[in-house]
Regions:
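Short aromatic-glycine motifs in intrinsically disordered, low-complexity regions
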Residues: 11-19
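Extracytoplasmic/periplasmic ligand-capture domains
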Residues: 21, 26-147, 163-194, 198-244
Length: 244
């Protein structure tokens, strides 16, 4: 965390810093209407090259609203999901920006239990064989093509492309090996195609944040792919307060 903290004046770094940030960058925050917009103005004391854009207004919009604003010519730049990359808007050009941001799934690694008065864990994903099978049984390239319109790269960890990324985390897509892992671990297919072990059905839910079309589409694609392995996944839109 400290590696990404900018130069901050000591007198301004207190409990109110998050509401009134001060730094040495190109812009100063002049107005923040929470949940609506934030307005920046050029920093007259900026040490670098001359700032050509003197004022920036960032509007907080969901993906659909951002796309609609661009179509109506109400925004100079609109950030939207790769799932909308096939949209053509007069007067705009599509820019693909390299990023270390990725979208993955978090799976419980402990068996069902209670901690601090709250239930945690999962009887299916606590089996390492299931997690390994999912890792090699998911076709990431298919997800990129079908969900992201080809705008993306496969991810194998939470830190792909970062300096500390370990290339050995990368795995080859091998659905046959994934099925073999599950068989060897005792997860056998039932008459409906879904696996079971010791009376536990290979089924769990995956949550995504409402309003995030990419997370939703990835979750649904994941469910379709895992069913081919004999794992049943249901998808559910829920806020972070519910998911965590």
């Amino acid at each position: 965390t400290m590696a990404i903290v900018g130069i901050v004046p000591e007198h301004a770094y207190d409990e109110n810093y998050g509401q009134n940030p001060i730094g040495s960058g190109r812009y100063l925050m002049k107005q923040w209407d929470k949940g609506q917009q934030v307005i920046f103005e050029a920093n007259p004391d900026y040490y670098g090259e001359e700032i050509k854009i003197k004022k920036l207004t960032v509007l907080f919009m969901d993906e659909d609203a951002a796309l609609a604003a661009a179509m109506a010519g109400q925004a100079d730049v609109a950030h939207t999901a790769a799932s909308y990359a096939d949209q053509v808007i007069d007067g705009y050009q599509l820019l693909r920006v390299a990023s270390v941001d990725n979208r993955g799934i978090n799976l419980p690694t402990v068996s069902p239990q209670e901690r601090n008065g709250k239930p945690i864990g999962n009887a299916v994903t606590s089996d390492a064989a299931v997690r390994r099978a999912i890792n090699i049984g998911i076709d990431r390239e298919e997800m990129i093509d079908n969900v992201l319109n080809g705008y993306g790269t496969p991810a194998y960890s939470v830190c792909d492309k970062m300096p500390w990324y370990n290339p050995s985390a990368q795995v080859a897509y091998d659905p046959d090996a994934a099925k073999q892992l599950l068989e060897e671990a005792g997860w056998t297919q039932g008459s409906d195609g879904i696996r079971e072990k010791d009376g536990v059905r290979a089924a769990f839910s995956v949550m995504y944040t409402p309003g995030d079309s990419v997370r939703q589409a990835l979750a649904e694609d994941l469910a379709n792919q895992l069913r081919e392995l004999g794992i049943e996944v249901t998808t559910e839109g829920a806020g972070w307060d519910v998911a965590y």
